[in-house]
Amino acid sequence: IVIVPVIYIFGMAFSNIRTDIPNQLWPENPNLEAFRYLFNETNFKKWYWNTLSIALINMFVGTVLITGAAYVFARFSFKGKKAGLLTILVLQAFPSFMGLIAMYVLFWKFNLLGQPRALSILYIGGSIPGNLWLIKGFLSQIPKDLDESAMIDGANKFQIFVRIILPLAVPILTFVAVSMFMGPWMDYMLPGYLLRFEPLNAPDGYDISNQWTLAVGLFRFINDLNYRHFSAFAAGAILVGLPITALYMAFQKYLIEGIMAGATKG
């Protein structure tokens, strides 16, 4: 059930089918025409860079901000703590598409329409509620005796956070970081809605496809009759899956530990 569709996608990627879906699992004469078409006749490299930059910003900046906030909620007592946690919990119940109009107005007011990297603001904000609760639940299970012992030895709060808390939280942080990388990687809704407008003061003859992400660009190959190319779509899908596969292979141990930790400590 799983292997056959994968083989079919690979077979389609190595064929040269532009308008019709191939009716065989593997082409009789495999070739690289679809890959050449992607790199030579489209802005695929630009789409890839736009998506990769958004995902990396979301992963690094988002993980740092969420980890810091989760540490504060897990280790400190302050006025409004319970209300803040309750608010974050409630925000998880609302789907992201409910805020599309507000997102458009926000981007329009700040002249961010057509700016791919600006999407990171929305992705980071949208990932805060669930991931903050996940990391906060993990950090709350780390004994506070470790903090007190370190303070007796002369460590301050920042040193405790960096030298004790972070090393112990590597599994859950890795899980959250990879999840935040995957979030914008193949998302179509936000870029499809906010990147269809030209940026402010765009020059004459501006190619709007330069600001697309992978999802928006690849979807054109199966949705636009003038550019329909199923083999190019399949070839792009294979290249899209490479970073995710590499991340899972590199951090498999930590991801499994993070999933288990989230299931038992969240």
Question: At which residue positions do the language-model features occur?
Answer:
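A structural signal for multi-pass alpha-helical bundles of membrane permease subunits
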Residues: I1-G266
